[in-house]
A protein has these predicted regions:
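C-terminal helical "tail/cap" subdomain of flavin- and related membrane-associated enzymes
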Residues: 310-383
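N-terminal glycine-rich dinucleotide-binding loop that anchors FAD/FMN and/or NAD(P) in oxidoreductases
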Residues: 46-71
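Conserved FAD-binding catalytic core of PHBH/FMO-like flavoproteins
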Residues: 61, 158-262
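Conserved N-terminal helical subregion
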Residues: 2, 59-63, 73-171, 179-184
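FAD/FMN-dependent oxidoreductases across multiple families
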Residues: 230-319
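Conserved Rossmann-like nucleotide-cofactor binding loop
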Residues: 14, 37, 165
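Glycine-rich FAD pyrophosphate-binding loop
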Residues: 23-46
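N-terminal Rossmann-like FAD-binding beta1-loop-alpha1 element of flavoenzymes
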Residues: 5-31
Length: 383
């Protein structure tokens, strides 16, 4: 039976990053993933799943050797961010305020994943098993891993990077705290009449926010949060009818659009009660999911990866060191989850006094330079 130092279950963005990081440290690593990412071509349609990548995440991707490959495919830098409910009460962020060329990048998830996968061949100590998936884990001095193909292998530690419905988390007997936001989120890729933009914006509404994320060329990703019933209704429309509905309910800043593709998913919050148990380590969505309000999901996952790699650099893996990783990350992730929930609950109602207060707060926030800069630095991973 093949034996490894670490088995990573899940080869998405976070799983690929942690596998690369451990391979870079010289450990014997196996990565198990069900689907190999498609080869990139410029003619491919944009992935409907995109992420707002922070400076901290770019640093991690550069350290892993993947960022240059990602940039050579397609990324869209953004330099400005605006958020508002009433048009006259806006909070604006600009990269110039921090002396940066851009606040971050909007990048398709599959492009990030593919950029990481392109680095695998550099590490003979990294084995990729794909397509295959986890069937069971048995715990002893090591972990025996059985795959759905019937293959078995052994690892000292298992990293769960297999998403919100993590099998690793279940096999490791790690509980979760979870609730449903009773909202769904629709992602809509559109063609715009404007040239490539450098701004991302979000308008709050009692029924849920509406967001704009620029993509390369004359394209953009729109995010529409609403009740499950409303999102189901939108999902049944033709592209032409949906475009009319979007232009009617989104801010005038959007302009004329053509719908290219769309999809939707329910909003839920999950947080693992432990990040480490039974020789299993959780990272990314396996450990925590967050309201996508600020696009911080994958950035939190990359922060997990950086913290895990840092605490284990040059060390034999031990439960004590892994508890340090858990302490370092669980509180930060909980803080971000709670912050997003606060914004969600504050803006998802139509109570008149609260509406007045929150709009005044947004207008005031735009004037408080030092505080605004600190909030922005935290979101960008600069502190």
């Amino acid at each position: 039976m093949n034996k490894f130092d670490i088995a990573v279950i899940g080869g998405g963005m976070v799983g690929a990053a942690v596998a690369l990081g451990f391979a870079k440290q010289g450990r014997q690593v196996v990565l198990i993933e069900g689907h190999q990412p498609d080869v990139y071509t410029d003619e491919q349609a944009m992935d409907i799943r995109v992420s707002a990548i922070s400076h901290h995440s770019v640093d991690i991707l550069q350290h892993l050797g993947a960022w240059q490959t990602i940039e050579q495919m397609r990324v869209c830098p953004y330099r400005r961010l605006e958020t508002w409910e009433h048009p006259e009460c806006r909070t604006r962020f600009n990269s110039d305020e921090l002396g940066l060329e851009q606040l971050g990048y909007i990048v398709e998830n599959r492009v990030i994943q593919l950029g990481l996968w392109h680095q695998f061949d550099q590490y003979p100590n990294l084995t990729v098993i794909c397509p295959d998936s986890l069937a069971s884990l048995e715990f002893g001095d090591d972990v025996q891993i059985t795959l759905t193909s019937g293959s078995t292998l052994c690892a000292e530690w298992v990293v769960g990077a297999d998403g919100a419905n993590s099998k690793v988390r279940d096999f490791a007997s790690i509980g979760v705290t979870a609730w449903d936001y009773r909202q769904h989120c629709m992602l809509i890729n559109v063609a715009t009449e404007d040239e490539q933009q450098d701004i991302t914006w979000q308008q709050f509404n009692p029924s849920g926010p509406r967001s704009f994320l620029p993509l390369c060329g004359q394209q953009a990703s729109l995010v529409w949060y609403d009740s499950p019933k409303r999102i189901k209704q939108l999902g049944a429309m033709s592209n032409e009818h949906l475009a009319e509905e979007v232009m009617a309910y989104f801010p005038a800043e959007l302009g004329h659009i053509k719908v290219l593709q769309y999809g939707s998913f329910p909003l839920t919050r999950r947080h693992a009660q432990q990040y480490v148990n039974n020789r299993c380590i959780l990272v990314g969505d396996s450990a925590h999911t967050i309201n996508p309000l600020a696009g911080q999901g994958v950035n939190l996952g990359f922060k997990d990866v950086a913290a895990l790699l840092k605490v284990l650099e040059g060390q034999s893996i031990s439960a004590d060191l892994l508890k340090t990783y858990e302490r370092n990350r669980r509180g930060d992730n909980l803080l971000m989850q709670s912050g997003m929930d606060f914004f969600y609950k504050t803006f998802s109602n139509d109570i008149a006094p609260l509406k007045l207060l929150r709009n005044a707060a947004l207008k005031l926030a735009d004037k408080t330079g030092p505080i605004k800069q600190q909030v922005l630095k935290y979101a960008l991973g600069l502190k």
